[in-house]
């Protein structure tokens, strides 16, 4: 309804158009003071101390219009010195020295060089140098890709960063944009247009400066970080409702509903389709509702919105507007098509065509209730009317800016493939139809993080994969679960299996791992405040939420070698488990590198892992490993959040042990375009000493529409011993096992004091102090969380195993003395170390028990118990 009202207002005040798209304060023409002319044929523009535009023109005419990539060259002019003679020009900034020998031939290794430092060593670049050390960027699509085996059609493209310290962006043949931000051809002449990024290993700085000239990566609406449900399958509106209802009935949240192409008439599309005059399968393009499945689209959208969902429809627009489409007459009238009865070719790069397309074809569907579009362009890469213009890029540009201009009250976004440099301005990304293999799962973290090298930070993958090789395969519960666990730490959380009866993603079809899947969904929703923080940082700095380790550790070789690992925001080291568990123990083992500079807290096991080491670590299917920097503070949602339509009133602050730390927590309204200026920041700090922990929440700074004056808190202090008392703003609050607001409790399974506070004024300082008993250390609790959670998960299988032989006998006393430790702590939290000491004393006894004669359990289950309970703990203590 909100979007409908916005649309009606626009229609009353303006004629529909997409040419008025804007990029804020972007000014394509550089400040004259940044420009250096060198003879009659060369021009250099000093954009930053390490970024220089280098142009050579045969006729001495240079280009000041925006290109598809570079839209803003009017930056603050850096300090630089120019030395000119009739034969040579030298430009020296604080970081680089450019030398050009004046002449009438294009740039080459003899007449141009740029000197700078990389990791303290002198680097010299000249034209034609090998760029094999480039750290790469991304590609248009992962269609048909198995693992890292890119197709020849869509190879991984070069990025803006290199181990050699430089990267060249050749903008020579890129299309331009006119004063209305519409596509314009470059003059055909002898001309070179290069940008050198000479940042050495200052990778984050290079990306920040890239956004100055190419535009920021917009902040998507908060709701887009929830679960996207999608399947290429023929569904009716009532079937879609049933699926959403069933997902929610088993406690799986959903925020985005994607309706694939069967929403429209497919005109008899089958496995041997008839082709139209454009070489496309008849029925692949469509704009006419398939009324047998969707008899009342407005009612379907009303239900979806009432259910808190955003919706999208799939588009394959390559076949233009066909005479059999319901919108044909309306489009022809708006466009002025003078060949009635003949199809109108797709021509998105013609302004008149694009305007008519939106007004006559798409906007009526939006008025029915559709929220955004999935642009599933898979056809010819370049325009038939502007050779060299990427259809993917221009579709994204037009659709995004149309939404931005015509729905000013809402934050625009679409779902699409990568169209080349500059595509970061149009979130979000669809990575395509991948092959379902363990190798594809393993590659997606690397691919996603590497895409940060061109600031493309919002890839959405088909979690679980899209299709089997040759459409022949069998779903695997463990693999799908591991994919969902990885997806928690990816930009978008989406499934999308292909149209095949063997490709199904209904969680209830995987009972053996259903609970682990549900836990992954819940963790994703808990992580959204942290994710949204990282998304804002992408907007501010140009660093995507998933980025390679070498951004932070550029001189460490492991940062380039461990490609399955990546940073998820600034405080979380993430990975994926892309191997099946051992057939006997169920444990999957991965190699991990923990960067130097701080320790890392394993959120799965509770172990504190020293930085500067590699480890071989085993995890069960119940474990989803992620590692937080010691001392960090992770903002989270409480465990009950199942929708992102509105922000939760309760903020969970998870304080990680091992060091002091801080957090800047970002908030805005989550939906509008006003986030550039209307937002708040809340600064949080934790300070730890031997016998106390102090968490300080400073008054909120800033404002945005609809913000509240108070909030509730759930403050969790991971792996911290039971306090002797807890003070809130200097006043002691009581302990309660089942705590309410104004009380604290002890979460024994996480070994964490938890403080609950309600209606805390956000404009006042909040101080929470844990006074800890002397004589013992929190480090004695490290790695116990893993034992507790594994015992909790394996106790029932243990009972079942033993019950096959004797259903009346108790579990072994050696096991119970270990597994029941958290229950003892919950009953008597002040006696925590008594029970922890008992566990540590009894663990060797349990190991001896497993080594002896145990007729009630099989050798295989003994091995499983040992691997889960004993070996994992011993490994984490190293």
For every predicted segment, state its role:
Residues 44, 52-54, 91-98, 573-576, ...:
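Short, well-ordered beta-strand segments enriched in hydrophobic/aromatic residues
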Residues 253-517, 552-554, 562:
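Aromatic- and carboxylate-enriched substrate-binding clefts and catalytic-loop regions
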Residues 66-79, 337, 601-621, 725-755:
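Solvent-exposed beta-strand/loop surfaces of large extracellular or lumenal domains
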Residues 7-17:
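Bacterial N-terminal signal peptides
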Residues 630-877:
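C-terminal low-complexity, glycine/proline- and small-hydrophobic-enriched intrinsically disordered tails
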Residues 84-222, 231-232, 244-249, 552, ...:
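Catalytic and substrate-binding clefts that recognize carbohydrates or anionic sugar/phosphate headgroups
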Residues 421-429, 443-444, 451-461, 468-694, ...:
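Catalytic core of carbohydrate-active enzymes
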Residues 47-87:
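A low-complexity, Ser/Thr/Gly/Pro-enriched, surface-exposed linker/loop concept
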């Amino acid at each position: 309804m909100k979007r409908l009202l916005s649309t009606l207002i626009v229609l009353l005040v303006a004629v529909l158009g997409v040419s008025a798209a804007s990029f804020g304060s972007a000014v394509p023409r550089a400040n004259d003071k940044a420009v250096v002319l060198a003879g009659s044929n060369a021009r250099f523009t000093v954009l930053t101390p390490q970024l220089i535009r280098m142009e050579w023109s045969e006729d001495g005419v240079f280009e000041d219009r925006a290109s598809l990539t570079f839209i803003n060259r009017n930056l603050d002019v850096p300090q630089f010195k120019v030395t000119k003679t009739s034969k040579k020009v030298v430009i020296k900034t604080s970081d680089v020295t450019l030398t050009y020998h004046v002449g009438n031939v294009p740039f080459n290794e003899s007449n141009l060089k740029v000197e700078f430092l990389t990791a303290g060593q002198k680097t010299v670049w000249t034209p034609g140098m090998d760029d094999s050390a480039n750290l790469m960027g991304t590609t248009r699509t992962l269609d048909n890709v198995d693992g890292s085996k890119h197709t020849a059609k869509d190879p991984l493209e070069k990025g803006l960063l290199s181990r050699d310290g430089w990267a060249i962006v050749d903008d020579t043949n890129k299309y331009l944009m006119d004063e209305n931000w519409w596509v314009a051809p470059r003059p055909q002449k002898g001309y070179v247009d290069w940008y050198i990024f000479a940042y050495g290993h200052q990778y984050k700085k290079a990306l920040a400066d890239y956004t100055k000239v190419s535009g920021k990566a917009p902040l998507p609406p908060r709701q887009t970080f929830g679960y996207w449900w999608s399947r290429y399958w023929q569904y009716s509106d009532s079937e879609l409702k049933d699926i959403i209802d069933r997902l929610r009935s088993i406690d799986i949240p959903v925020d985005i509903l994607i309706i694939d192409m069967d929403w429209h008439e497919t005109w008899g599309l089958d496995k041997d389709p008839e082709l139209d005059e454009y070489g496309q399968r008849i029925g692949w393009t469509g704009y006419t509702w398939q009324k047998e499945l969707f008899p009342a689209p407005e009612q379907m959208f009303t239900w979806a919105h009432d259910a808190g969902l955003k919706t999208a429809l799939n588009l394959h627009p390559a076949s233009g507007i066909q005479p059999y489409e319901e919108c044909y007459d309306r489009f022809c009238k708006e466009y002025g098509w003078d060949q009635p009865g003949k199809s109108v070719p797709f021509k998105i790069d013609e302004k008149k065509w694009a305007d008519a397309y939106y007004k006559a074809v798409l906007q009526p569907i939006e008025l029915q209730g559709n929220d955004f579009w999935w642009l599933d362009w898979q056809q010819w890469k370049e325009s038939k009317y502007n050779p060299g213009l990427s259809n993917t890029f221009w579709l994204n540009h037009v659709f995004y800016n149309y939404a931005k201009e015509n729905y000013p009250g809402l934050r625009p976004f679409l779902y699409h493939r990568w169209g080349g440099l500059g595509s970061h301005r149009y979130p979000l990304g669809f990575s395509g139809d991948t092959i379902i293999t363990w190798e594809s799962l393993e590659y997606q973290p690397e691919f996603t993080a590497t895409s940060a090298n061109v600031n493309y930070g919002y890839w959405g993958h088909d979690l679980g994969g899209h299709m089997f090789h040759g459409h022949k395969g069998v779903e695997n519960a463990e693999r799908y679960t591991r994919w969902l666990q990885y997806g928690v730490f990816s930009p978008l959380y989406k499934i999308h299996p292909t149209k095949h009866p063997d490709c199904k993603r209904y969680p209830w079809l995987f009972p053996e791992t259903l609970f682990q899947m549900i836990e992954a969904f819940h963790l994703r929703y808990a992580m959204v405040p942290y994710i949204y923080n990282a998304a804002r940082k992408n907007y501010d700095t140009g660093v995507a939420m998933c980025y390679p380790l070498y951004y932070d550790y550029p001189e460490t070789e492991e940062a380039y070698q461990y490609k399955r690992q990546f940073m998820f925001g600034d405080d979380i080291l993430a990975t994926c488990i892309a191997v099946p568990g051992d057939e006997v123990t169920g444990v999957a083992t991965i190699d991990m590198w923990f960067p130097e500079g701080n320790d890392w807290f394993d959120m799965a096991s509770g172990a504190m892992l020293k930085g500067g080491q590699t480890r071989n670590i085993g995890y069960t299917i119940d474990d989803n490993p992620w590692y937080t920097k010691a001392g960090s503070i992770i903002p989270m949602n409480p465990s009950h959040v199942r929708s992102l339509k509105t922000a939760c009133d309760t903020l969970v602050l998870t304080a990680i042990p091992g060091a002091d730390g801080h957090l800047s927590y970002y908030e805005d309204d989550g939906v509008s375009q006003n986030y550039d200026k209307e937002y708040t920041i809340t600064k949080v700090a934790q300070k730890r000493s031997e016998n106390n922990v102090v968490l300080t929440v400073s008054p909120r700074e800033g404002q945005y529409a609809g913000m509240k004056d108070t909030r509730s808190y759930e403050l969790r202090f991971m792996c911290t011993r039971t306090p002797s008392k807890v003070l809130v703003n200097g006043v002691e609050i009581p302990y309660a096992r089942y705590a309410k607001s104004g009380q604290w409790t002890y979460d024994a399974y996480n070994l964490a004091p938890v403080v609950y506070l309600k209606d805390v004024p956000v404009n006042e300082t909040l101080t929470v102090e844990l006074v800890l008993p002397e004589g013992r250390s929190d480090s004695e609790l490290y790695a116990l969380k893993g034992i507790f959670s594994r015992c909790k998960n394996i106790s029932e299988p243990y009972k079942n195993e033993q019950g096959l032989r004797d259903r009346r006998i108790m579990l072994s006393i050696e096991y119970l003395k270990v597994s029941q430790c958290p229950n003892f702590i919950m009953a008597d939290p002040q006696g925590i170390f008594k029970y922890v000491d008992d566990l540590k004393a009894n663990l060797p006894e349990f190991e001896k028990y497993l080594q002896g004669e145990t007729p009630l359990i099989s050798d295989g289950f003994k091995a499983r118990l040992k691997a889960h309970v004993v070996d994992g703990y011993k490994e984490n203590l190293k």
